[in-house]
Amino acid sequence: MTLAEIKAAVDQGLIVHWASPSYRVKRHDAGGYYIAHDSGQAIALTHHDGQTLNGEPFEFFLAT
């Protein structure tokens, strides 16, 4: 998935995972996006440039 596809899916209320179902892309109150693990740890969806994903595009997928 591209960055735009990931953001659009999350904004539509769809569940987007990264690498495994244990990781989920979420949007925080300030409007940014992050990848959260079931354990509670999280990282930003992108690098500081706001464009480069923290992960490969093929690793992101919609929940079934």
Question: Model segments located where?
Answer:
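Mixed-charge, Lys/Arg-rich low-complexity intrinsically disordered regions
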Residues: M1-D11
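Intrinsically disordered, low-complexity, charged/polar segments
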Residues: Q41-T64
